[in-house]
Amino acid sequence: MKALTARQQEVFDLIRDHISQTGMPPTRAEIAQRLGFRSPNAAEEHLKALARKGVLEIVSGASRGIRLLVEEETGIPLIGRVAAGEPLLAQQHIEGHYQVDPGMFKPSADFLLRVSGMSMKDIGILDGDLLAVHKTQDVRNGQVVVARIDDEVTVKRLKKQGNTVQLLPENSEFSPIVVDLREQTFSIEGLAVGVIRNGEWL
């Protein structure tokens, strides 16, 4: 499957979620309304692009004539390297699905993120580990979070004060990342809830 743009991924996710919730795909008008397109024609162009990339099929003559070709996997999605500026759960970032009970983590894990680097080694998060992440923006100071600064994603301990966020490493060889909320784009992707190493929950 060819990589999707961020906007195409939004359209794909909307269709998938709509089918999951209602049992049928959305109309072009519904896609346009939900995603803020000016007209159903704009939605149609995105559908054609998705069809060219092989993730869906357009069935002519039906307002809901959309069939997804990417089979839904079971298990927790495993996210590998994240390209700058793209959604964390974009289809092209998912390396596969891990068969693990999400309920073994508290709160439950929504996805696994492959750790890159040793900046959190002092608390047992090592390069190559799979970090279990609960997707939320409701986090507190002192918690280990998956954060996005501008276009980059990182795992660090959160310390927020006023308009400044410090993302603290757990390795003395690394320096804290300081974010000025007045000048930089910052968001929380989720809360770290556990680690899997070599197939075993730690």
Curated annotation (Swiss-Prot):
It is an enzyme of class 3 (hydrolase). Residues 28-48 bind DNA. It catalyses: Hydrolysis of Ala-|-Gly bond in repressor LexA. The active site is at S119, K156. The keyword Magnesium does not apply. The record marks A84, G85 as: Cleavage. Keywords: Autocatalytic cleavage, DNA damage, DNA repair, DNA replication, DNA-binding, Hydrolase, Repressor, SOS response, Transcription, Transcription regulation. SUPFAM superfamilies: LexA/Signal peptidase, Winged helix' DNA-binding domain. It comes from the Bacteria. Pfam families: LexA_DNA_bind, Peptidase_S24. GO terms for biological process: DNA repair; DNA replication; negative regulation of DNA-templated transcription; proteolysis; SOS response. The keyword Membrane does not apply. Its EC number is 3.4.21.88. NCBIfam families: lexA (TIGR00498). Belongs to the peptidase S24 family. Homodimer. Represses a number of genes involved in the response to DNA damage (SOS response), including recA and lexA. Binds to the 16 bp palindromic sequence 5'-CTGTATATATATACAG-3'. In the presence of single-stranded DNA, RecA interacts with LexA causing an autocatalytic cleavage which disrupts the DNA-binding part of LexA, leading to derepression of the SOS regulon and eventually DNA repair. This is LexA repressor. It comes from Enterobacter sp. (strain 638).
